[in-house]
Regions:
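Short amphipathic alpha-helix that is part of the acyltransferase structural core
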Residues: 1-39
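Acidic-and-aromatic substrate-binding clefts and catalytic sites of carbohydrate-active enzymes
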Residues: 45-47, 105-106
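Generic detector of bulky aromatic hydrophobic side chains
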Residues: 17-26, 67, 89, 95-100
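Conserved beta-hairpin
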Residues: 47-64, 68-69
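Context-gated lysine
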Residues: 4, 32, 37, 58, ...
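Helix N-terminus capping/helix-initiation residues
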Residues: 35, 70-71
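Acyl-donor binding region in acyl/amide transferases
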Residues: 71-112
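Short secondary-structure capping micro-motifs at structural edges
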Residues: 38-44, 50-54, 80-87
Length: 112
């Protein structure tokens, strides 16, 4: 069971959520070289739309996921390496998990 002092407040600010997510990125081998400006582009739209989840254990945050609901057109562009634009995060009905970080624990236990 997580230590509640390690979790975000009930109604966290955009800055509080972004701080946790960017902190997790900084210790992720895959994400640690992403510039903060790029992190903003990747993570602020889903945070603003409440399309994220952060996991915690007794030592603090352990991972997060952000998702989008993409139109067919946006999904095709995304599959071809074109990033989702801020106005496209809710462009359709197709659920896409855009980014996932897990620094402790298995991915399998997080997605249950």
């Amino acid at each position: 069971m997580p230590d509640k002092s390690q979790e975000l407040p009930r109604n966290p600010t955009l800055g509080e959520v972004f701080s946790v997510i960017s902190g997790l990125c900084m210790v992720s081998d895959f994400h640690k070289n992403i510039r903060i400006k790029v992190m903003g582009t990747l993570f602020l739209p889903p945070i603003q739309l409440n399309q994220f989840r952060i996991w915690y254990d007794k030592d603090g945050p352990t991972g997060f996921v952000v998702w989008a609901f993409l139109s067919e057109e946006v999904a095709e562009r995304y599959k071809n390496g074109i990033p989702v634009q801020p106005h496209e995060w809710q462009s359709g009905k197709n659920l896409w998990f855009i980014n996932f970080v897990s620094i402790r624990g298995s991915l399998k236990e997080k997605i249950r």
